């Protein structure tokens, strides 16, 4: 909704000017979001190009050296076109407060002039490297998978998935095995993007379980299609579901010191935050068969709930394979012996997370925003094991100096 769509131009999703009916003073709006510590992204569909009604159309075609009066289709292999687009439309928005970009390319796969140039891969490259080469902000891009090697640039958008339990059940395997091609940052429309039948309401139990899994994924993000029945804001649900969703969000914020440290490890080693069991236990046969569980960093094992609760008991049964050694349930502290498969019933307020005995997990208290002053770090020690350590990583979270300026 940030930009208007001209039906005279054939509709579509592309636009470069702000919708002044919804945002009469967009600069003030961006400034307000910044004051609240909220990062801003804008959704772009570059394939339809730049149309004559855009305010900066004349400046754009002048810089690009293009004939006047027609829609200028995307030309990613034309350096002059790309530079003109960024200089006239994108860089000014960054200067005014846009923090990162969300691309959505779903049109023709190859460039129309260079037939071997993949449009998704190339869009990821040029948007990311433009951010890398201009300004002080740390580059961040959200877009589709562009093939092998594309992990260097974007956080992945997995597409407009359907909502059923089968989709949720596939995600642990999908997320963890993506690490085999170094693609550690998949982002999903948590709870699904669309129903198979328009107007089907969100199922609170399924959405809660999806969000609980999202708490233990590299990226937690909820999104859905334009359907009035698919509102996913916590306040759109009953009070019990609101409380559970709030617990997920607070729990995610609390784990940021652990997650951020593991993300730095991913950056340095290529070992993804979310990975299959056989990464950590390659010589154990069971590790190769457990497709519905995964390691979340070095210390935590996640066995997601991917089936609904029993209608009579209100509990869901989950099996988890625990490697050799001692493990503790993250929420209860219950000690369990490894080298076996355990099964337990979980209520809607519980989730199967196991921590290696001897682990040290840093976390925050209750926080509302990570953009403010540094939060006090609390340390939780899980007893057992022979020894335990954790090398905490921190940087300013904003600029490119993380390469050499950080604290451990």
Residue ranges: model-predicted function:
Residues 1-351, 355-356, 396-401:
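Catalytic-domain carbohydrate-binding cleft regions of carbohydrate-active enzymes
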Residues 350-408:
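Accessory, solvent-exposed terminal regions and/or long lumenal/extracellular loops of proteins
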């Amino acid at each position: 909704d940030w930009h208007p769509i001209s039906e005279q131009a054939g509709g579509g999703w592309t636009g470069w000017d702000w919708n002044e009916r919804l945002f009469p003073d967009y600069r003030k709006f961006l400034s307000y979001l910044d004051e609240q510590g909220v990062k801003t992204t804008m959704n772009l569909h570059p394939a339809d190009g730049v149309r004559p009604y855009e305010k900066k159309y004349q400046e754009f075609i002048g810089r690009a050296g293009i004939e006047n009066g027609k829609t200028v289709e995307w030309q990613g292999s034309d350096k002059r076109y790309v530079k003109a687009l960024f200089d006239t439309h994108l860089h000014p928005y960054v200067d005014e407060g846009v923090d990162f970009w969300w691309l959505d390319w779903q049109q023709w796969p190859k460039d129309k002039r260079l037939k071997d140039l993949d449009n998704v891969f190339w869009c990821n490259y040029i948007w990311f490297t433009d951010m890398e080469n201009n300004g002080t902000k740390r580059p961040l891009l959200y877009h589709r998978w562009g093939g092998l090697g594309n992990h260097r640039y974007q956080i992945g958008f997995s597409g407009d998935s359907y909502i059923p339990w089968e989709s949720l059940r596939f995600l642990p395997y999908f997320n963890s095995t993506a690490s085999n091609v170094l693609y550690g940052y998949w982002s999903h429309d948590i709870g699904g993007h669309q129903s198979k039948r328009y107007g089907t309401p969100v199922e609170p139990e399924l959405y809660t379980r999806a969000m609980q899994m999202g708490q233990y994924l590299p990226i937690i993000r909820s999104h859905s299609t334009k359907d009035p029945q698919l509102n996913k804001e916590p306040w759109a649900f009953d009070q019990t579901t609101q409380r559970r969703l709030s617990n997920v969000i607070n729990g995610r914020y609390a784990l940021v010191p652990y997650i951020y440290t593991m993300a730095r490890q991913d950056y340095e080693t290529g070992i993804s935050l979310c990975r299959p069991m056989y990464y950590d236990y390659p010589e154990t046969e069971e590790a190769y068969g457990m497709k519905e569980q995964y390691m979340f960093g070095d210390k935590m094992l996640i066995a997601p709930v991917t089936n609904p609760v029993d209608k009579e008991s209100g509990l869901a049964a989950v099996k988890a394979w625990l490697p050799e050694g001692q493990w503790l349930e993250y929420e209860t502290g219950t000690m369990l012996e490894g080298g076996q498969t355990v099964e337990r019933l979980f209520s809607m307020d519980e989730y199967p997370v196991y921590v290696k005995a001897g682990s040290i997990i840093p976390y925050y208290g209750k926080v509302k925003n990570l953009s403010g002053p540094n939060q006090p770090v609390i340390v939780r020690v899980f007893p057992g094991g022979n020894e335990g350590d954790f090398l905490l990583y921190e940087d300013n979270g904003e600029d490119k100096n993380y390469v050499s300026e950080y604290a451990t």
